[in-house]
C-alpha cells in the first residue's frame, strides 16, 4: 500500500509544481503590463490649460455641474481633483478666464481649454512726498465655504497703505471704503462653534501679499516666508526667477495633493524711490497674478472632521502716494453705499450665482 501511494503521489506532486512554475512565469510576463495599467489609472487626470499658450491653469476653482458645491482647485500642473473626474459635469471659475461648463462624459481627450479674460493695468508714474505711503485702491471679493457649501460672501472697496522698505509685502494698514455682505444661514446649521467662527466674516485684506522681483532678485533658490498655525499645516516659500523678472509664492499644505504656486509679476513695495514708474514693459500685468490666494483651514474634532475654505480675489483699481494728512482724512471717511466696479465681474460667475441664495447682511 505504501509503495502504491508513493508511486501515485510523486507524479501528482511533480505535475502541481510544474503548473505552479508555468503560472509564475505567466505572472512575471504580465507584471509590467499590470503595473503600467495601475500607474495610468492612478495618475491619469484631466488637465485645465490656457486656450492660447496651452500652459496649465493653476488654482482654478472647480464646482459641480450646478455650481452649488465646491469640489476643489486645480494643482500646479493644472490637473483636476480626482473627485471631480467622477462627476458627469463640472463648472470652472478662474479670475483671469471666462467661466466654463464642462460635460466630462463628452470630453474627447483629457484637456480642458479656458479662454483668457485679461484686465489691463495702465502704466502710472507717481511722485513721492516726504513721509508719504504708497496707497492702493482695490476691489476685493471674499468667500468662505463651509464643508463644500458657500457660507458667506463679501465685496469691498478699500485703500491699502504700504510703508517704505516694506519687507513682507503685506499692507501696513487698510481702510474699508464700502462693502456688501451676504450670508447663507443654512450652511452653518449643525456645525461646531469653531467652524462657524472661521466661516464668518473677517478682514477681507488678510490674504493680501504683494512682493515683486525688485526685492527678491538678489535671492538664489527659495526663501521660507513663514509657517501658518498648526491646524492649517501650511508653509510658504518665495521662489525667485531673475531671468523672467518674476517670483512666486509656493504654499505647501498638509491637506493638498502637492504644493501649488501663485505667480507674482512686476510690483515691489520695498525700496520705494522718490519717483517710480510701474511699467508694463515686461508685459501687461494680469491682475489675478497680483493677488488670487486660496487657503484652507481644517479643524479636527472627536467624532467628525470639518473644514473651511477661504477664497480672496483682489483687483487693483489705482496706485498713488498719500501724505499723512491725506491718510488721516481717509481714516475719517464713513462707509459709503457699495457699488461694484464695472467691467470686472463677469455676469454669471461664482459671485453673482452664489449670492442669489443668500441673505444680505447690513
Range-by-range predicted roles:
Residues 1-47:
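Bacterial Sec-dependent N-terminal signal peptides
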Residues 46-52, 78-79, 112, 124:
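A short, amphipathic beta-strand motif
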Residues 52-66:
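Short, ordered, surface-exposed loop/turn motifs in non-cytosolic proteins
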Residues 60-64, 90, 126:
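Hydrophobic beta-strand segments
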Residues 68-79:
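Short, acidic Ser/Thr/Gly-rich low-complexity loop/linker segments typical of extracellular
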Residues 80-88:
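Short Pro-Gly-centered beta-turn/loop motif in secreted/extracellular proteins
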Residues 91-102:
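A short, solvent-exposed loop/turn motif at the edges and junctions
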Residues 113-362:
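Surface-exposed, low-complexity/disordered segments
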Amino acid at each position: 500500500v505504501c509503495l502504491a501511494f508513493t508511486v501515485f503521489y510523486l507524479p501528482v506532486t511533480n505535475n502541481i509544481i510544474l503548473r505552479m512554475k508555468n503560472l509564475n512565469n505567466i505572472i512575471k510576463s504580465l507584471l509590467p503590463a499590470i503595473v503600467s495599467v495601475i500607474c495610468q489609472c492612478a495618475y491619469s487626470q484631466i488637465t485645465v490649460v490656457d486656450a492660447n499658450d496651452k500652459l496649465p491653469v493653476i488654482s482654478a476653482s472647480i464646482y459641480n455641474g450646478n455650481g452649488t458645491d465646491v469640489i476643489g482647485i486645480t494643482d500646479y500642473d493644472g490637473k483636476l481633483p480626482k473627485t471631480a473626474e467622477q462627476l458627469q459635469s463640472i463648472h470652472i471659475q478662474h479670475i483671469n478666464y471666462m467661466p466654463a461648463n464642462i460635460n466630462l462624459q463628452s470630453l474627447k481627450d483629457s484637456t480642458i481649454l479656458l479662454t483668457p479674460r485679461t484686465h489691463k493695468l495702465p502704466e502710472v508714474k507717481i511722485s513721492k512726498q516726504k513721509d508719504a505711503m504708497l496707497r492702493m485702491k482695490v476691489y476685493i471679493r471674499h468667500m468662505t465655504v463651509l464643508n463644500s457649501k458657500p457660507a458667506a460672501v463679501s465685496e469691498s472697496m478699500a485703500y491699502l497703505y504700504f510703508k517704505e522698505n516694506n519687507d513682507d509685502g503685506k499692507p501696513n494698514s487698510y481702510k474699508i471704503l464700502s462693502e456688501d455682505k451676504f450670508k447663507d444661514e443654512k450652511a452653518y446649521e449643525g456645525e461646531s462653534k469653531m467652524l462657524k467662527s472661521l466661516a464668518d466674516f473677517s478682514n477681507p485684506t488678510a490674504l493680501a501679499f504683494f512682493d515683486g522681483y525688485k526685492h527678491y532678485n538678489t535671492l538664489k533658490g527659495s526663501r521660507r516666508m513663514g509657517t501658518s498655525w498648526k491646524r492649517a499645516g501650511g508653509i510658504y516659500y518665495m521662489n525667485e526667477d531673475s531671468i523672467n523678472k518674476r517670483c512666486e509664492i509656493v504654499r505647501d499644505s498638509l491637506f493638498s495633493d502637492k504644493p501649488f504656486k501663485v505667480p507674482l509679476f512686476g510690483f515691489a513695495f520695498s525700496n520705494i524711490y522718490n519717483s517710480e514708474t510701474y511699467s508694463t514693459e515686461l508685459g501687461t500685468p494680469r491682475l489675478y497674478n497680483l493677488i488670487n490666494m486660496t487657503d484652507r483651514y481644517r479643524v479636527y474634532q472627536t467624532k467628525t472632521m470639518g473644514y473651511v475654505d477661504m477664497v480672496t480675489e483682489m483687483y487693483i483699481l489705482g496706485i498713488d502716494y498719500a501724505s499723512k494728512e491725506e491718510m488721516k482724512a481717509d481714516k475719517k471717511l464713513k462707509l459709503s453705499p457699495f457699488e461694484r466696479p464695472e467691467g470686472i465681474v463677469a455676469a454669471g460667475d461664482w459671485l453673482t450665482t452664489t449670492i442669489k441664495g443668500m441673505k444680505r447682511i447690513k
